[in-house]
C-alpha cells in the first residue's frame, strides 16, 4: 500500500529580488538547474521581525557570493518553521565557487531555533515571476516504489496542482538522505487560492 506524506505550507513574501547582472557572469543564460532551499524555525520568545531582517540581509550576501537569485518567504500556515529561503544556481561548479567565497566571512550568533538546508534539482519551472504568495508542498512516497514510480506520481500531482494554480515549480531532492519531491505554486491572494 502506498503511503504519501504531504506537507502543504503557505508563505508570504518578505523580499524577493533577481540578480541578472552581466558583469558578474550571470544573465538570461543562467540555467538555474538547482536551488539551495532552507527552512528556519523561530526561537522561543524571538521577535520574528528581527529574524526576518537578518534573513533578508543574509540572502543579499548570498547573491554577492555568486548565487543567481535568492529570496525569502515567511510562513503563514501549516508548520512551526518561520521562514523559507532559496537561492538558485546553475551547477555544482558554481556552488563550489560560492562556498569557497563565503567561507571567509565570519558567522554571527545563531538567532533561530533550528534550520535545514536541501539542494534540490529543478525538474519543471512554470513560475516565471515572484508570486505574492506560494503554497509549498513536500511529497515523500512509499519506500517500496521505484524511483521511476515515485517520479510518475510526482508528475501526476504536479500536473494537477500546476493546472489548478496556473503555475508551479517541481523539484527533486538532489543531495542528502531524502527521496522527496517538492512543489511551489504561486497565487496572488486567498481569494485566488480558494478558486
Stretch-by-stretch model annotation:
Residues 9-17:
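Bacterial N-terminal signal peptides
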Amino acid at each position: 500500500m502506498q503511503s504519501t506524506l504531504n506537507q502543504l505550507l503557505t508563505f508570504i513574501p518578505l523580499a524577493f529580488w533577481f540578480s541578472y547582472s552581466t558583469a558578474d557572469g550571470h544573465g538570461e543564460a543562467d540555467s538555474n538547474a538547482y536551488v539551495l532551499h532552507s527552512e528556519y524555525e523561530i526561537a522561543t520568545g524571538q521577535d520574528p521581525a528581527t529574524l526576518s531582517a537578518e534573513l533578508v540581509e543574509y540572502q543579499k550576501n548570498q547573491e554577492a557570493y555568486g548565487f543567481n537569485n535568492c529570496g525569502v518567504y515567511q510562513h503563514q500556515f501549516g508548520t512551526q518553521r518561520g521562514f523559507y529561503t532559496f537561492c538558485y544556481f546553475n551547477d555544482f561548479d558554481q556552488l563550489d565557487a560560492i562556498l569557497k567565497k563565503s567561507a571567509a566571512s565570519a558567522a554571527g550568533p545563531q538567532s533561530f531555533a533550528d534550520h535545514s538546508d536541501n539542494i534540490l534539482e529543478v525538474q519543471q519551472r512554470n513560475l516565471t515571476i515572484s508570486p505574492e504568495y506560494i503554497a509549498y508542498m513536500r511529497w515523500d512516497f512509499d519506500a517500496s516504489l521505484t524511483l521511476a514510480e515515485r517520479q510518475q506520481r510526482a508528475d501526476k500531482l504536479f500536473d494537477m496542482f500546476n493546472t489548478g494554480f496556473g503555475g508551479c515549480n517541481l523539484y527533486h531532492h538532489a543531495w542528502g538522505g531524502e527521496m522527496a519531491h517538492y512543489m511551489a505554486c504561486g497565487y496572488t491572494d486567498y481569494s485566488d487560492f480558494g478558486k
